[in-house]
Amino acid sequence: MEDERGRERGGDAAQQKTPRPECEESRPLSVEKKQRCRLDGKETDGSKFISSNGSDFSDPVYKEIAMTNGCINRMSKEELRAKLSEFKLETRGVKDVLKKRLKNYYKKQKLMLKESSAGDSYYDYICIIDFEATCEEGNPAEFLHEIIEFPVVLLNTHTLEIEDTFQQYVRPEVNAQLSEFCIGLTGITQDQVDRADAFPQVLKKVIEWMKSKELGTKYKYCILTDGSWDMSKFLSIQCRLSRLKHPAFAKKWINIRKSYGNFYKVPRSQTKLTIMLEKLGMDYDGRPHSGLDDSKNIARIAVRMLQDGCELRINEKILGGQLMSVSSSLPVEGAPAPQMPHSRK
């Protein structure tokens, strides 16, 4: 829940030869000379490829990838969809998304032939969390947001399937009475929160559920959110109100808005949940501002990004109460095994 009211794997690992279809389009290089565009990274006239900075790439495979990318850049949306369909890849999305998807497919195929992948690129599981919290119309600066819905969607990164879900409502204690605006926005009723446990009890249930999935022990995992606010604001405020330290497993996470913007090269204004879905050719499924439904839709975006070749990895953390970015140059790391945090003194 961000503070903005009004997000089949391509390629066959066993494939022995990278597909080398031709693009029918011809591009004039000069009045006398024309060059056919091929998706095998080679030029039909045998001329030497030079990188944009004037020097050769060190490995021929990167020349092939660059040539393929150039051809893809010149394809129409219909040609992109036809080529994606040929390889049984997802054909929905805006043109820039389709280009990125096809480029990553060819890149993965070519690099797979060059050398086998070394090491773990992905987490075994991603836990998608999108809190719903108490709110008032206009969100006054002094208002203390309390978590009233704690959902978790467990995404298996190997099968790209939602393996399980967790959902619990939470009883607020500072502002026990929900505003009409909050009820209308989230669909959560006063009766539902009145009958719910307080946050410490719900957090304990979440941790027990995560432990039952062997997260952080048998399986490498991390948290993923739609924006920074869920972990850096809502959970942080709630832990202070409940006199708990911030849970160690929730101190680092993937902000999918940041990952989406960086991967598809779009501005932050284009990374709201509904816009991300739209650009990927999907509709929102469920009730907006239901924490569980939001989390499921965020998971759908994560799946599509993984299919398109994005390496989702931790990119934000909270340290000393401050939100900080995590450099992509650091080694991939998972969240620690979930433990109930100690009480604050």
Swiss-Prot record:
Q: Does the keyword Acetylation apply?
A: no
Q: Which residues bind Mg(2+) 2?
A: 130, 230
Effect the entry attributes to changing residue 132 to G: No effect on binding to 5.8S rRNA
Question: Boundaries of each SAP domain copy?
Answer: 72-106
Residue spans of biased composition, Basic and acidic residues class: 1-11, 19-46
- Its domain of life reads Eukaryota
Which cofactors, by name?
A: Mg(2+)
EC annotation?
Answer: 3.1.13.1
Gene Ontology cellular component? cytoplasm; histone pre-mRNA 3'end processing complex; nucleolus; nucleus
Q: Which InterPro entries match?
A: 3-5_Exoribonuclease (IPR051274), ERI-1_3'hExo-like (IPR047201), Exonuclease_RNaseT/DNA_pol3 (IPR013520), RNaseH-like_sf (IPR012337), RNaseH_sf (IPR036397), SAP_dom (IPR003034), SAP_dom_sf (IPR036361)
Chain segments carrying region Disordered: 1-50
| Designated name of the protein | 3'-5' exoribonuclease 1
